[in-house]
Amino acid sequence: KFAVFGYPTVIVFSPEAREITRIPGGMDIQRYVSVLELALNAIRPVADLVRSVQQGQTLADADWNLLAYYSWSQDRGQVMDKSIDDSEKQRLFHLLADACPAVLTIAKSRLQMIAATMWAKLETPDMAYQASYLSQLKAVLADDQLSAANLESIIYDGASLTAALLEPSQQAAVREQFNNKILAIIDNAELTLPVRLRAISGWVELQKSALDKDAQLSDSQQQWVSEKVAWGEAAVNDYQRHSAINTLWQTLYAAGLNDSARSMLLDALTVSKQPYYFMSDLGYLEKQLGNNNQAVDWYKRAWESSKGPATRIQWGVNYVVNAIELTPD
């Protein structure tokens, strides 16, 4: 009904039941509180604000901040029409970023980075945007306040932005800047632990982007990942554990530490109140490793042990789809 994609997603409605905005999970708690307060005080929904910008109208500062912190990745047609392609989305984000007043440095930089990241992931990006996006990226990397405001881009988008915006001979230096930013996030005790754990995953993807296709991280890099994952697993509390394990096993898998990823998931089965989630993850892991029979078995066990009517339908469909794909005979 509400087109929710990913948990947790907070959707703020007006008294008339119109969606004002949706706020992504994952940001640091202080910024989350400020964005939530901004949304609760908002009068106009994000969809209306976008239309106003498209019509050349002036927005209040609070409106721009609401646009900058909207969960665009979880929009699902609530603001942007589902029929528009990624190129059209990029042009929309570019319009928003360009129209945002320069005095609103944080909001403008966030909209610029959203546009640049969307552009970098296009199959055939319009190179007319390259110079401005590279300038914006350099500005963010050079400014600690802008980097902190664009935490998601620092963690997740370093590889794609570096590859799209720079010539191969220039990429190493910018990757090193991203590397230093990510390491600072991991070591920053003022940030929430889930954010710091996701930064480990971002570090892995950044290092892999410098390698030839199908190449693995070095032994020393894998050892570093193992140590950081062990630290993260030991640091989480019971309320954080399920989400943390979901992040950490995928980090191990991305780093080529498949046995460690499997062991983490198997251990999670013994402590989780919803082990079927991790059974499904084990199915995915074995599928990726080419162990089809084991994968189907885990998908089946996930379905058999799942609780709740909607969950059982979801896991049941997942089992059937994978059984047909992996064991067609």
Model-derived segments and spans:
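Generic helix N-cap/helix-start motif at coil->alpha-helix transitions
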Residues: L59-W64, T105-A115, D144-S160, A189-K208, ...
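Non-catalytic, surface beta->alpha helical segment in thiol-disulfide oxidoreductase systems
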Residues: V4-V46
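Structural motif corresponding to the intra-repeat A-B loop/turn of tetratricopeptide repeats
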Residues: T124, A255, L289, L326-P328
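Solenoid-like repeat scaffolds
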Residues: Q54-T58, L96-A102, L137-S147, I182-P194, ...
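Charged, amphipathic alpha-helical linkers/stalks
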Residues: R31-Q90
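Residue at a conserved register position within TPR or TPR-like alpha-solenoid repeats
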Residues: T162, Q207, L252, E286, ...
